[in-house]
Amino acid sequence: MRFYVGAIRRCEAKYNLFPEIKHFCLAPTLTPYAPQGAKILLDSGAYGDVRRGRFTFNQGLERQLAFETKHQFISERIASYDLLIDEQMREDRRIKSRWAEKAGWKAVDETIAAAEFLCERRESLAPRQLVLGCQGVNIDQYETCVSAIQEIANPEDCIGL
């Protein structure tokens, strides 16, 4: 199992963790913070889009690839643009709040479509491995999402929970 560390800026300043950490998860919406030669999992940026508004799948991927180009690296892994089910906007601020079950099915469908979109571009994204996100507000939804994504995934892909 490989663990990719995110939000390292705060931890590194306090604990000087760079010598031990080799795998980082970066968001295309934030300033990258990883040592030279680190292995990068490039997140979709969907978390920040809860506040800004969602992109299309293509816009999300273009943002990820532009981020790589700007910062001169190629990710080891790249994440699909799933629809997060535990973040909502309330009165101009993002809060941690799980969606209702009925609304959760929309997130499942959108997340499966995001994985399909990325899988269709597998060859052009090489050598990056795909991280196919899964969502759901309950076990039935997660099972539906994971099962559908397993149908389109390749053995070298990762499932993101």
Give the positions of each predicted feature.
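Non-catalytic, usually N-terminal nucleic-acid engagement modules in DNA/RNA processing proteins
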Residues: 1-119, 123
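Glycine/Thr-rich beta-alpha phosphate-binding loop at enzyme active sites
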Residues: 95-104, 129-161
